A protein has these predicted regions:
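Non-globular, low-confidence helical/coil segments that flank catalytic cores
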Residues: 1-204
Length: 204
């Protein structure tokens, strides 16, 4: 599943294709034909069930796919993962670049959603992760996926303040580096690893 086709969300897909056999791609917009990949649009209601994992698409609604071209971010595929027969982190909500409108609709459509890990919308932008959304979901952990020294300042100070006020721990790839959830001894745990790499500021 690609949440949408912005480069920072889909750019590595050709490399993934080289390493992992992909039977079908799911996204809110169809990829260029040169990628030669069976495709399906994502929309609310899609579900896939496996012995150890349930996957659901919670957003966008099928009727909203017509508006994706004008607002890719807001109509990102929002994915809900439920791992079964494991301890630790079990329920994951991955927001893509969706913002407040999607959050409001999710709370309306799924009032009893159980979340252990929330991957913040739009890298922790101030226009996502509304206070009421965070307060209702009450995740055990929030994740902000953002590039080091990114020009937007993600995750935003406003979102960081909301999380602190609600006592929701935050892990950020800016601070912790690569974040990986790993199954160990029937329990899903989080590992972080900062690569030994030279970072150049934008001034160079």
């Amino acid at each position: 599943v690609l949440s949408h086709l912005d480069q920072d969300h889909s750019g590595a897909f050709p490399l993934i294709q080289q390493e992992i056999p992909v039977k079908q791609l799911i996204s809110n917009e169809q990829l260029p034909n040169d990628l030669k990949q069976p495709f399906q649009y994502c929309h609310q209601g899609q579900q896939w069930h496996y012995p150890e994992l349930d996957i659901q698409i919670l957003w966008p609604k099928e009727k909203d796919l017509a508006f994706v071209a004008s607002n890719q971010n807001q109509y990102s595929c929002v994915v809900y993962l439920q791992f079964k027969k494991v301890g630790g982190y079990q329920n994951f909500l991955i927001m893509g670049d969706a913002g407040w409108e999607a959050e409001y609709e999710l709370l309306k459509d799924y009032p009893n959603l159980k979340i252990d890990v929330l991957v913040l919308g739009h890298h922790g932008s101030k226009h996502s992760s509304a206070y009421d959304f965070l307060a209702t979901l009450k995740p055990k952990l929030a994740i902000a996926s953002a590039g080091f020294d990114n020009r937007y300042g993600h995750p935003s100070q406003q979102v960081i303040a909301r999380l602190k006020a609600l006592h929701i721990p935050l892990k950020s790839t800016v601070e912790q580096g690569t974040l990986s959830f790993v199954l160990e001894n029937h329990k899903i745990v989080l590992h972080d690893r900062r690569l030994d790499r030279l970072w150049l500021s934008r001034g160079f």
